[in-house]
Each structure stands twice: as C-alpha cells, then as structure tokens.
Amino acid sequence: MTLSAKQLPIDDIKISVINALNQHQTLLLTAPPGAGKSTCLPLWLLDLDCLSGKKIYLLQPRRIAAKNIACYLSKQLGENVGDTVGYRLRNESKVSKNTRLEVITEGILTQILQHDAELTGCGLVVFDEFHERSLNADLAFALTRDVQLGLRDDLKILLMSATLATDSIMQQLPEAICLESEGRSYPVDISYQAPSNAKLWREHALAVLKSVVNSHQGSILVFLPGTGDIRYLAEQLSAFMPESMLLCPLYGDLALAQQQQAIAPATNGKNKLVLATNIAETSLTIEGVDLVIDSGLENVALYDTQTLSNKLTQRAIAKASAIQRAGRAGRLQAGHCIRLFSKDDFQRRSEQSVSEIQQADLLPMLMELGRWGASDCAQLPMIEMPESKREQLAWQELIDLELLSTTKQLTADGKKVSAFPCHPRFAKMLISAQCLEQQQEIPHLLSLACLLAALLEERDIFNSEQRRDDCDIGHRVIQLCQQAKKPHHQRIIVQAQRFFRLARAQTSKPIPEQASHHIRAPKSAVNICLSASELPIHDCGLILMHAYPERIAKQRNNQGHYLTAYGKGVVMNESDALASKSFIIAAQLFQRRQSLSIALAAEFNLFQAIAWGIVKTASKTYLQFDNQLNRIVSAQHEVIGALVVKDTNTSQKVSPELLVACWCQQIRKKGLDWLKFDESSQQLLLRWRWLNSTQAHLLFPEAGEAFLLANLEQWLGPYLTDVTHKAQLDKLNFSTLLLNQLNYQQQQIFKQIAPTHFIGPTERKCVIRYSLEQAPVVSLPMQELYGVTVTPAVGDSTNNSQIPLIIEILSPAKRPIQVTQDLVAFWQGSYREVQKDMKAQYPKHFWPDDPANAQATRKVKRHL
C-alpha cells in the first residue's frame, strides 16, 4: 500500500519546516526512511511565502529516483509530469514554462550553475539523500553555497537525509537550523548466514536464494556488489524460479524503462525477486518486499595513483549501509533480512563509508572548479576537502591534458571539453579527433573517437577468454560494429552516436546553454559511421593519445614489457599481437600482483604524431659515465616524459650542474671505494668516524659512507664542475675536500682531540692509527719510551672522555715485542722478562733496570 501525505511522519514537523525556511536561509533536515521527506515535503515547498513563486530544484542522487519522485508528486497534484512538477536528467527531461519544482540529478545542477551562476528564477535548492556524499553532490553543494554567500543572499538551501553527519556540515553552515523527523518503519528480523569460504560468496548466495524463492510468499530484494554478480545469479536462478515470481535486475546502467519495471508493483498476484546493486539502498521503495538478502559487499570506483584512473574494487559495506539495506524489508510491513556474513563481521565494520571525494577520480570535479574560476578546492565552501596530494596530482593532469593553463584557467580546448557529457580525457579525445579529421583529411576519425570513448565508459565487450591474449581496443571497435544489434553493444553505440552529434553541433554552431549534459544532442547531424571497413582502425592509438598522453609507452628489451611516459613500467602477455609493437598507448591498466598490466591498448605511430605536431618532444642533454673511455660523455635526447625517443652523441659544452649530477650518480652507483682515497684520506675518515663514535658530545658532522654518498653534492660537488675524466677525479686532494666541511674552530678541535701523530720524548712523530674496533694504536721503539710514566691518550680532556692509546712497543729491529695500554704497569711488571730477552738479542742497546726513570734515547750504548 502507498501511504498518503496525511499519514506520513514528516507531517508532524510541517509547520516547523515552513517557518524555518521562511525565516532562515539554510535548513538541515534529518528524517529516517519512510518519513515522507521525498514524497510529501516537496509539495509543501511550492507554497512557501519566501519563494514568491520562484522555482525549486530538488536533487536526487539517482536518475530512476528523480523520475519516480517527479511522477509521484505530479500524481499527488492530479497533473501530468512536466506541469507544476517536472524532471531533468541526462538525455531526458519533462519540464515546461509552468514547472516550478524540477527534480534533477546532482550533475545537472552543476551544469545549470555553470551557465547561470546566479540561479536566476530559483529560490530554493533541496539536496535529498545528502548523506551519500557523492562527488557530484559535494560539488553541487559547494557551488550553490558559494552563490548563496556571494551573489544570492536570498537563496535557500535545504539538506535532507536519513542520517546526516551534522558536525562536519555545520562547519560550513554555522547559521543553519536543524530539524529532525520521526520515521516510519516496521520491525525487521535479522539473521546471519555467512559462507564457509568468503571467496565463494556467490555460490553461497545462490544456495540461499534457491532455498527461499519457492517457499517465500512475498517479494525479495537481493543486494549484490555489481552487474556481473547480478547476471550470474539471474542465469543460475532462471531454471529454479516459480511461475509466481518475476526476476528483475536493477542497476544504474540499466535502461530507465527496465529500472521502472524492477520497482513497479508486481501485477496479477505475482511477487518479485529483485537483484540489485546499492542503487536500491535509498530513495526507491519496491512494494511488497519483506525479505532482503544482503551480500554485504559493494563495487566502488577507487582512483589508483599508479594507473592514473579509476579501478573497480569490491569491498565490504559500512554498518550504515547494512542498516539501510535491512530497512528496505520493513518499509511497508514487518520483514526479515538475511545477511550473508557473520555478526562478528558486522560488528567489526566501519560506521560510515568513506566519502567519494577521498577516493574517486578528481579530474571531472576539478574541471568544473576550473570553469567556475577556482584554482583550489579550498576556495569553495566544500563539506570536505580532498587529500592535498591527490588534488594537486589531478590539477597537474588537467594541465598536462592542456585543458587548463599553468594558472588553472580554462584553455581554448578546456572550454570546448566542458560542453561534453563525459570524462575530460574522453572529451579531449573527441575534440582532437574532429580537428585531426579536418586537418589531415582522415575520413571517419571522429566516428572512431566516439566509439572509443563510448567503449571506454563501459565494461570490456570481450569475454575473459578473448581478453587473455588480446588487449587491442581496435578489435573491440570491429566487434562492436559487426555485432551492433547486441543489447550491450546497442547501448554503447547510442552513447557514441550522442557524442558524435554533440561534436558535429559544436563545430557548426555554439551549443545552447545547458545543452550539454541534459538536453538531447541535435538529431539533424550526420550519423556516426559503423562500418568497420571504413573506420581508420589503425589510428586508434593516435586518438587515444589525446586522452592519455602520459601513457605513450615504449617497448623495453623484453616483448610485452613497456615503459610509459609517466615513468611506470607496464606489461601485457607476450602472446598478444601488440606485444611486439615499438610504441603503444596503454588506455586501461590494472594492478596484477607486483606489476601494472595492460587491459586495453592500441599501436601508436609516434613519429607520425611528432611530424604532425600532435606530440611534442623536449630536448634534454643527458650525461653518462663511459666505462671504456673512463670519462663522462654527453648525448642529446629527444624525450617525452620518461621516454627517450631519439638520442645523438654531442660534444657541446655541458652545464656544470649536469656534470656534478652525473659524477654523483656514478659515485653512488660504484660506492665510495671507487674514489681514489690515499692513505692520508683514509686515515682522516677513520679519525673523524672514531671521533664521532667516542666523542659524540662534540656534535661533529657525520662522516660515514652512507652520509658522504648522500651529500656528495655538498662536499665534493663544487670541485667537479669542470671534471670530465676519471683521471682528473683521482687527482683531487680528498683530505682537503673533506676537511673543508669543518669550520676553522672545528678543524682546530679535530687536530687537538684526534691528532694524527704522537710525539714521543725523543721528538719522533709517530703515526696514530685509528680504528672503530679498538682504541687508537701508536708504534715506537722501547728505548724512546723510557721515562714515560703516563700512558698517552687522545680525546677530550675537558669531558673525561680521553682514551689511552694502545702502545705497540718495538724492538730495535722494529718488530713488536709487547702491546700495552698501561705503561706504568708494563714497567713494573712484564718489562723484566722482556729486558732479559732484549739484552741477549741486542746487547749494544740500553736496557735499564729502572725504565720509568731512565732517559729516552734513539742511540746505542756507546753513543750515550
């Protein structure tokens, strides 16, 4: 049964709603499903005193909901759709000069605003189901709010939803009035039937459905993630369906007539089994449904920064969505919901879904911002800002597509692209194809571009077996034309035909305001060419390049392996016919394990595109170290992003910066040992590293290999500006270069704390050998240590961090005879044994009985 307006809970707050809108500019209304906010409240708005007869725009997130609500409201008024209440959708509208309430989809409002920033004649904009937070809704709200704040202080805004996160919204609408309505729903019993293996959820769903279709007496609504799942279950269930039950698919890409059939009341005493995506979560009421079966899954388009495009991802729905789905069983009577997952799984899920602005492709939205005159999301009153890095990446993509200038103003191409109801990439492809068709006299190039754009908007028309070894999109065009009568193909061709007419109309005369996106393309234009033999299939790559300039890809050494202009490696099966081509355009990519795989591509005649001026290369001087010549050589490269398309050796003088960069790259590749550090340089580094490890309080700069390699430009770079040969590099005084990193005071401390030599009593300079494994070592003959009673030490004497040297005591023949770090203990202890041996071996030398008080000497006894 259908509830009349008088029976609906929203009626209880009618006076409050009317007063709030008459007295304030902004209202937030929270009303659960079944309250009547979409089917009753809009009719009250027509009589608002504050509107003075002005128009109302009522936004709906889905086309089928917009059309149904317009029809329902018109019926309540006893009028035809298009009189007082009308609707406007993409490609379809029913409005007249008498229409005061237009039910529209969110993207339509954006286009209306772009053509009329003051919303002339409109007094109120109503955003229904705002909790869904689609990208289009966020954008439409931001533009409307911008108009309200800057141009139309009389413009009213009403946000309605079953559940509104009012905290974030109130930040942008601090003056808004908040109202809440009771809902009307019936109890829904919830049970959980999780599959034993989550990967086999479709088979489990099929088993559950088989068990209920013949026993359940009412209509059943099944929530599935995507259209592929709907088709699979529909095919598997066809043989099990009782005659009393109709099987109806319901998803966004379905023709409106078929969507209408799915939600219309069943006739002749029959029930329905509706297999739906999340399109049926809100807005739509399917009469007779008292059983919901929820897969707990959804397919969402997530923007992948690796592929620079959306990827369809299946994921678990949030709790809020699961609650909404279950509620569909209790809209008109008590019901039951079977969740195909466990209760524990439900409890672990997030409360709300992530808003689309944080995960979707931002290019279409930022293109609209550019049209609006904004160069940053922060310039508009957005409910939520996208992540900054993603936003900046998207702006740069639009600049690279030459749709925006570097100052984020619309270019000439950008203005043309804004007239097309498709992604900016595809629109750029269409306008470029039309221009090339005329300039290069290539027949039917625009037709081919329109077919490619329409194909890329849809799922692949090849089955999985065909796709395995054939990613050539040109073959899809041929199949599309040869099998044009297939239902799926027909939808693609209709869209391609629409693109074609819009493009033709754009060249003949300016498209009227609001024509793009929501007025049908002129039918007087010539029809698209669908003859595969006449289409320039070999030019697919030429067309696709305008949509994906960063995906020009050059073959690497291995067949099927390519490098793209934006620096990512991509692969296709080696058996694919395209795998041997030198250059391709990788139109669609997907992540497979650790690599990016090509789903759709086309061969690309790069050098023809360069000759025609379609692709512009940049000249880049490239230096590299030649191992055979042992020197740096230079080459002139013609590059497209990361791709080198042509290189020639050159002897021209190169900039010092490039020389330094090349040397640093080579040294990092080879390691620090590749530099010819002499003994002095090596000892310097050992002293420095020893000082850092034992005298950390001095806060000296680092001198480890990793640090020196990372900072080559600072300590070595200034001395490489005219070095071209390795022999020149080897001649550099690395000790001096390293010491130059210390200031004068640090150098003096370095000499004092970590001296290079120990000067003994006989004035001999003995090298101190530093090590990170032990204390520093010094070697000298025993005779030159007589009289030394304090072991020499290095380190900071002011900080109690001195370290005694390891003394390697030598015989007159300069052979080690003892090692000690305590001379006093040596003189008093093991010296006696050493003295005996030395007297026997070297009788001419002086071996005193009291070495601690003897005079150090270099002489033998007869010269003393």
Residue ranges and their predicted role:
Residues M1-M429, K509-E513, H517-V526, I584, ...:
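P-loop NTPase motor module signature
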Residues A20, Q172, V208, P265, ...:
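Residues that form generic nucleotide/phosphate-binding pockets
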Residues Q23, N214-H216, A579, S680, ...:
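Solvent-exposed loop and beta-edge segments used for protein-protein assembly and interaction
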Residues V126-F127, A255, Q259, S432-D460, ...:
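Charge-dense polyanion-binding interfaces
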Residues E182, R331-L332, A360-D361, L446, ...:
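A short, structural micro-pattern
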Residues S244, P249, I293, A301, ...:
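Second RecA-like catalytic domain
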Residues I263-A264, S531-K581, N733-G787:
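Flexible, glycine/threonine-enriched loop-and-boundary segments that flank and lead into catalytic domains
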Residues L629-L864:
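A positional "C-terminalness" feature that preferentially activates on distal terminal regions of long
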